[in-house]
Swiss-Prot record:
Pathway: Amino-acid biosynthesis; L-proline biosynthesis; L-proline from L-ornithine: step 1/1. The lineage of its organism: Bacteria, Pseudomonadati, Pseudomonadota, Alphaproteobacteria, Hyphomicrobiales. L-ornithine binds at residues 53, 77, 120, 235, 301. It comes from Agrobacterium fabrum (strain C58 / ATCC 33970). GO terms for molecular function: ornithine cyclodeaminase activity. This is Ornithine cyclodeaminase.
Length: 354
């Protein structure tokens, strides 16, 4: 059997590669295309292996692994969440991911996922709103103006036509930065001085805060009939963004209940509180929005299938392009069983001055 060529090489997508791919595609186009992959995979939800992400919690944050497989491809993401990182000039969230071939176990792709996670989170939020928000929704309150905020705004614009954004953050500089970054994209933007002001007249409310504690970003009196709430900040036990009474008034939609009950807003509720899985709405097995008066809540914590979709999308996009580089990642001896022989040959090569 002839030897297969370049088995040691895995395509690697660096941060620079990912940025170039996004801007050359157009950020809004990228979000729309990525959303298509996510929705396609949600519609075949039952074909995936699914487990809650594997988390290692510490005093200051969490490190997680998020694996899944559809039987043909296997993907996982390494991701952290450390809210205090910004004080030392670091990102709150960083990530990378791998997509592999199930038959051989060989990696097909290694990619940065800090930027890609922000894109896939925003795309998933906007997909949910497509099914759960009122069809005439054009105004969104965006509470928490950190690293995720601009991505959320652009995804909602690209997928459902939101063009008015009401911003609020406890840090006015974050709001000012977000406003500057979004001005070129055609939004009508209002910087608000409180969360209460931000939600006035909003059709959709997105919360995307980072603090790792039980907070009340939204209180019950702030939520009127017909609103869709996009709760993005939940990602670990003990971290919530809204008052429990809001949950009791809302129809709640989730990605994967076993994970959301641990990490999402619904950790405040009884373990058997009824929720609807988003994939069932997409496939017509359950109903999303039933009336213009209904309050809907997407309790988003992020799930591995979204990362799988993102890696699959990027793999397809970079194939044959300049948006990746070859990475010598896998040992590839001439004889598969002679791994030690590789070391001996390398030793001999170095002795000869190579």
């Amino acid at each position: 059997m002839p030897a297969l060529a370049n088995l040691n090489i895995v395509p690697f997508i660096s941060v620079e590669n990912m940025m170039d791919l996004a801007v050359s595609t157009g950020i809004e186009n990228f979000l729309v295309q990525l959303a298509g992959y996510i929705e396609e995979d949600f519609r075949r939800w039952e074909s995936f292996d699914k487990i809650p992400r594997i988390a290692s919690h510490s005093r200051d944050g969490v490190i997680e692994l998020m694996p899944t497989s559809d039987g043909t491809l296997y993907g996982f993401k390494y991701v952290n969440g450390h809210p205090k990182n910004t004080k030392s000039g670091r990102q709150t969230v960083t990530a990378f991911g791998v997509l592999s071939d199930v038959d051989s176990g060989y990696p097909l792709l290694l990619s940065e996922m800090t930027i890609l996670t922000a894109l896939r989170t925003a795309a998933t939020s906007a997909i949910a709103a497509k099914y759960l928000a009122r069809k005439d929704s054009r105004t969104m309150a965006l509470i928490g103006n950190g690293a995720q905020s601009e991505f959320q705004a652009l995804a909602f614009k690209a997928l459902i036509g939101v063009d008015r954004i009401r911003l609020y953050d406890i840090d006015p500089e974050a709001t000012a930065r977000c406003s500057r970054n979004l001005q070129r994209f055609g939004f009508q933007i209002e910087a608000c001085t409180s969360a209460e002001q931000a939600v006035e007249g909003a059709d959709i409310i997105t919360t995307a805060t980072a603090d790792k504690h039980n907070a009340t970003i939204l209180s019950d009196n702030m939520i009127g009939p017909g609103v869709h709430i996009n709760g993005v900040g939940g990602d670990c036990p003990g971290k919530t963004e809204m008052h429990r009474d809001i949950l009791l008034r809302s129809d709640i939609f989730v990605e994967f209940p076993p994970q959301t009950r641990i990490e999402g807003e619904i950790q405040q509720l009884a373990p058997d509180h009824p929720v609807t899985e988003l994939w069932r709405v997409m496939t017509g097995q359950d109903v999303g929005r039933k009336s213009d008066k209904q309050i809907t809540l997407f309790d988003s914590v992020g799930f591995a299938i979204e990362d799988f979709s993102a890696l699959r999308y990027v793999r397809d996009r970079v194939e044959g392009s300049s948006h990746s580089s070859p990475l010598d990642l896998l040992a590839d001896p001439d004889e598969p069983r002679d791994l030690f022989g590789m070391l001996l040959r390398r030793q001999a090569f170095r002795r000869l001055g190579g």
